[in-house]
Amino acid sequence: MSDIRLSGQTALKAHTGMGLYVCPNDDEGLNSLYYTIEVNDAQGVAFLRRLLTVDVKNIHRGEVRQSFILNALGLMTDFVWVAHLPDSDEHFRVVFQSLDTLAWMHQVAKAFDEDFTTLKTSTAILFADQTNTPHGLMADGKVQVMKTSKGEVLAMRVGAMTLLQGEEKAFENFTHPGMEMLDELSAITLCYVSKSPLAFAWQANDLMPGDVNGAAYIDFSDSSRMFIGRALTEARLKAGEAKKAVVLSSHQDEAEAWFENPSEVILLTEEGVPVAKSAFVGLLGDKLTCVAFVPQSTDSSRLIWMNGGEEQAYRVEVLS
């Protein structure tokens, strides 16, 4: 069985059970999948309120949210997890993907006289409908510190994904009955199936929140809080038709062959009108799967799937 086909089978097993992806970690800090900072003072809170599209003042102790970081043009430059740790009103952890973001954060922090802490920590992602901890089932949107034989692990759950952080040894040789150990492709596929493509692939295109179902990650409630990119984002969301995320699989044979020559997926109506493009493609079992952001009025079950550069079109199955 090829590695790609094996990834698809692993993703399918984890989708009906649970899976763990241990993220790459570079000791030099240059090629890690995630980077982490913490703030623990009033200046740090002000810094995050300027930087993030969610408002940390509305994240209570022990809660976690996801957020965009935008540039001045309103384009998404990163997608982050923001956890309000239980021990303090001003203690927040921010987990993001781009090393460029870290460099930019240092520049923005100077304006707030803020000296945040960069953490060296290992990260894993648990995919499961329910997250069991030594303290019982973990609620959605919550943070929990777990004490294990390999040190403390911080768990941050959003939907079917739980971000775990701890010492490197915490994830070494980790096994659990019924848990699939995921490779990168199977982990990405599960992100797409959970409608969270931005957890891995926000950098695939120049996107604005209005291009995706981005309203869930933006807090406009405080009119005086001018986060970077706010004005353009607010105007675009008001002017454009709301989008919904749909997970589709195509009725095409030999789906794994797509990965030999990846291309953008184009989704069309039955009349041949393009409604969306998607670069967020994975393999679930033997089915080529994608998540796309289409207008709310779209009948997803009638969409036609085309791979960029091909003339063949395929019917779709709506997974969610």
Regions found by a protein language model. Give the residues of each.
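Acidic, proline/glycine-enriched N-terminal capping motif
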Residues: 1-70, 74-75
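Conserved, structured C-terminal
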Residues: 2-27, 31-33, 83-320
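Long, hydrophobic/aromatic-enriched structural stretches that serve as scaffold segments
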Residues: 72-88
